[in-house]
């Protein structure tokens, strides 16, 4: 074979190899395109995602693609369409209270990253229930937990997490800078109210869906404060009560009507012989009922009810089963303040059923220990101390604290009535437990049911002191 023939042969072989390679590459491209079409052709991109989602440590894996989604809760099988929570249903008939949640946050916080908190409360939308709380800007078992017995500081903030979970940096959502707060959902968005600032010039910041919409300046310059539990939404309007003035004498009390975060009306209560603090409010047949704390001179609880025009009535629970702490032994009640052991108090709640009342209270008369629910069938209007039902929730030997009401609307439960619920704060640490350098709490909650319930104790259960305390 001469040199020219060798060159032609080698060139032909190279060209053949190149053509084969090109054909293989084209086949590879076609196969990838066909495979992609098969995978995506049948998907409806506007519908609900049917992929399997596995959540671990606040991160989401979707088809082996890592996506970090912070503070996002996927509510499976729920229609997320906005609604208007009517709030016009009556309270559900109940026979007792079923345990609903327990977060065990102090126990978990001995080893995990859990916020130092107080004043937890629960509020529900038509899709979910969340625990709100006032953090101290510190974690349990950390040096910044020192001195957190203080109520008001610039480090406190209103945050929220899914109900039943220990509040941590990994599952909690920031809501507002606050040392006093309230929150509620109207079916379309969350309203949050956070009060912060100096005692003589605090300001309440209103947010709707996370955006500042309004502010309220302290009008008496005496520690503006609000409910420390959920506000109430009825037919698109939300209602809250604020107090400004002395904690041991007559103060100023205002009701605010709020729509999408904007104040549309407010009134001041004419109640010179009453004292209203830290009200626990709920809707009932289109009206709002609030049961509050008298820190001035009442060992029974004051109440105020009002309609959507803010026409109101006031009074005190008449029952001789007294609901505040400290309080005297049960006996002769009054529809006015019962002044025996009436000074000081603790946030609490009651539910009215006609002339009857479910009273939530500490088991101890003098300290924040234990908790029980009592059904007094005539206690709203009569002054005797007779009752029919007592359900134990926390034993006398275990610490409790604040308590408050929240409801589950029919839009959430599917019932034709408003389900009454309540939460109890289980305070640990200072000032009572002096082996610690901190003050914090966990929480439990219960909901009313018309079926069997248990008498038991669901205490905080943490073993103190922690490592930081030694």
Swiss-Prot record:
Disulfide pairings: 92-417, 124-129, 184-231, 233-238, 279-292, 281-290, 318-335, 421-447
Virion surface face of the membrane: 28-470
Residue numbers spanned by region Head of neuraminidase: 91-470
Domain of life, per lineage: Viruses
Cellular location(s): Virion membrane; Host apical cell membrane
This enzyme's EC code(s): 3.2.1.18
Swiss-Prot/TrEMBL keywords: Calcium, Disulfide bond, Glycoprotein, Glycosidase, Host cell membrane, Host membrane, Hydrolase, Membrane, Metal-binding, Signal-anchor, Transmembrane, Transmembrane helix, Virion
Membrane topology (Intravirion): 1-6
Glycosylation sites: 44, 58, 63, 70, 88, 146, 235, 365, 455
Active site: residue positions: 151, 402
One Pfam family linked to the record: Neur
Regulation: Inhibited by the neuraminidase inhibitors zanamivir (Relenza) and oseltamivir (Tamiflu). These drugs interfere with the release of progeny virus from infected cells and are effective against all influenza strains. Resistance to neuraminidase inhibitors is quite rare.
Cofactor(s) needed: Ca(2+)
GO-annotated cellular components: host cell plasma membrane; membrane; virion membrane
Binding-site residues for Ca(2+), renumbered to this chain: 294, 298, 324
Residue ranges, annotated region (Hypervariable stalk region): 36-90
Membrane association type: Single-pass type II membrane protein
Transmembrane segments: 7-27
Chief subcellular location: virion
Matches recorded under HAMAP family: INFV_NRAM
Description of how the protein assembles with itself and partners: Homotetramer.
Record-stated family: Belongs to the glycosyl hydrolase 34 family.
Listed name of the protein: Neuraminidase
Species assigned in the record: Influenza A virus (strain A/India/6263/1980 H1N1)
Gene from which the chain derives: NA
